[in-house]
Regions:
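Class I SAM-dependent methyltransferase Rossmann-like catalytic core
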Residues: 1-23
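A short glycine-rich, Lys/Arg-flanked "PGG" loop and its adjoining helix->strand segment in the class I
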Residues: 122-134
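Class I SAM-dependent methyltransferase SAM/SAH-binding core
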Residues: 42-97
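Core SAM-dependent methyltransferase catalytic element
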Residues: 186-189, 194-209
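A short acidic, Gly/Pro-enriched loop at the edge of an enzyme's catalytic core
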Residues: 96-107
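Conserved alpha-helix/loop element of class I SAM-dependent methyltransferases that forms part
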Residues: 21-37
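C-terminal alpha-helical "lid/dimerization" subdomain adjacent to the S-adenosyl-L-methionine
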Residues: 141-186, 193-194
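A short SAM/SAH-binding and catalytic strip from SAM-dependent methyltransferases
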Residues: 105-120
Length: 209
């Protein structure tokens, strides 16, 4: 199965911190203050679920969360998290496949789109866009590379990552595709943009018009 992190589920967070220290964690945590109380939230590709506990620190109750993860082992780890009084529905499915039956106030996609080729980015973005309330928030974070920056180390690191994860997790993408054009075309407004790890990680809080 493409983009499935089952083989390294137990070690994924450790690997992330070994390479990126806490940059991936900070990119996500520093967006969470934007989540309104009582929100319905879609988290797609949430990994081991540590984000659920961070959300619960801010909102210990009142949230309804749909947690979608393609890796069964990641999902099992997520179910063990302390979500306090929040209601979480765990769904074992790919982001492009699960049936969306709810309109959400907040969508969270952290390091999800870097797994996809261009056609799947368009597919997943379109589905999630339709599922987000007008005025809703999309908390986006992912790797970022601008060739004009002259930071060749980022290019080499990207190639190494894709080679590794293609072997381990059958990641379908071979190159990082910038997704900002999707949000721009759909008239999203960026409320906050932040960079981490020397600009290699970018997080944006978008608001749907």
């Amino acid at each position: 199965m493409h983009n499935n992190y089952d083989p390294i589920a137990r070690y994924y967070d450790v690997l992330s911190r070994l390479v990126f220290f806490r940059a991936q964690v900070r990119a996500q945590i520093e967006q969470l203050a934007f989540i309104p109380a009582g929100s319905t939230i879609l988290i797609a590709g949430g990994g081991t679920g540590w984000i659920l506990e961070e959300i619960a620190r801010i909102h210990p109750s009142g949230l309804r969360i749909t947690y979608v993860e393609i890796s069964a082992k990641m999902l099992d780890l997520s179910k063990k998290r302390d979500v306090k009084g929040n209601q979480v529905s765990y769904i074992h499915a790919a982001a492009e496949d699960f049936g969306i039956s709810t309109v959400y106030d907040v969508i969270i996609t952290a390091f999800l789109f870097d797994n996809f080729r261009a056609e799947k980015i368009s597919l997943v973005f379109g589905r999630f866009h339709q599922a987000l309330e007008s005025g809703g928030l999309w908390l986006f974070s992912d790797f970022y590379y601008n060739p004009a920056s002259g930071k060749r180390w980022q290019w080499y690191l990207l190639k190494t990552m894709y080679l590794f994860f293609k072997q381990i997790s059958e990641v379908e993408a071979s190159d990082l595709i910038n997704t900002e054009h999707c949000f721009t075309a759909a008239l999203y407004r960026p409320l906050k943009t932040a960079y981490y790890y020397g600009g290699f990680i970018k997080s944006i809080v978008y608001q749907k018009s």
